[in-house]
UniProtKB/Swiss-Prot annotation:
This is Molybdenum cofactor guanylyltransferase. Pfam families: NTP_transf_3. The N-terminal domain determines nucleotide recognition and specific binding, while the C-terminal domain determines the specific binding to the target protein. Transfers a GMP moiety from GTP to Mo-molybdopterin (Mo-MPT) cofactor (Moco or molybdenum cofactor) to form Mo-molybdopterin guanine dinucleotide (Mo-MGD) cofactor. Its EC number is 2.7.7.77. The keyword Magnesium applies. Keywords: Cytoplasm, GTP-binding, Magnesium, Metal-binding, Molybdenum cofactor biosynthesis, Nucleotide-binding, Transferase. Monomer. GTP binds at L12, A13, G14, K25, N53, D71, D101. Its cofactor is Mg(2+). GO terms for biological process: bis(molybdopterin guanine dinucleotide)molybdenum biosynthetic process.
Length: 199
């Protein structure tokens, strides 16, 4: 059994925020609280500890009271670079990731991913949702992985790889169906943020 205390949560806040006009998405307020803080509040009860991957506004993220680590791969290499930074610093056997703009993530996310890894003998686990037409949508930026995946991630990034799904598929991967697709909604634009503000 994968115990909660054996899992560290990593909030991915290292992106450019290009679809939000270059603003730092994790620090944009939703109902008066930064989005990354909403994500932290959802994830905290599910893990033994937390850390943040960020590449700018480091003092602001450090004020959240958890360790902050920057990418060790240059040029904003995407979420996998953030995952790499997290794995390099992770002090527990397992790490789970969530993007900073996912303030509605399921409260049972980590437990269900951990159960699937155990039940299927998998290495990694990611959620899957269904869109309005019933098509499967993988949510690979939410990923439970062992720290031992570090070497394969280094090799994949060194070879120029950037897609989470491709890297994840090179392992024994458990895909866990979640009914509430809205729980995985990312807030990518200021218009989407305003829409959620009025709900």
């Amino acid at each position: 059994m994968i115990a909660r205390d054996d899992i560290t949560g990593l909030i991915l806040a290292g992106g450019r925020g290009s679809r939000m006009g270059g603003t730092d998405k994790g620090l944009q307020p939703l109902h008066g609280t930064p989005m990354a803080m909403h994500t932290m509040m959802r994830l905290t009860p599910q893990v033994g500890g937390l850390m943040i991957n960020a590449n700018r506004n480091l003092a602001a993220y450090e004020s959240f009271g958890v360790p902050v680590y920057t990418d060790t791969v240059p040029d904003f290499a995407g979420p996998l670079a953030g995952m790499l930074a997290g794995l390099e610093q992770c002090a527990t056997p397992w790490m789970v990731t969530a993007p900073c703009d996912s303030p509605f993530l399921p409260t049972d996310l980590v437990a269900r991913l951990a159960q699937a890894i155990e039940a299927e003998g998998a290495d990694l686990a990611i959620p899957v949702t269904l869109d309005e037409d019933g098509r499967r949508q993988t949510q690979p930026v939410f990923c439970l992985m062992p720290v031992s995946a570090l070497d394969s991630l280094v090799a994949y990034l060194s070879g120029g790889g950037r897609k989470i799904e491709t890297w994840a598929a090179s392992h024994r991967l458990a895909e866990v169906l979640f009914d509430d697709a809205a729980a995985f909604a990312n807030i990518n634009t200021l218009d989407e943020l305003r829409t959620h503000e009025t709900r």
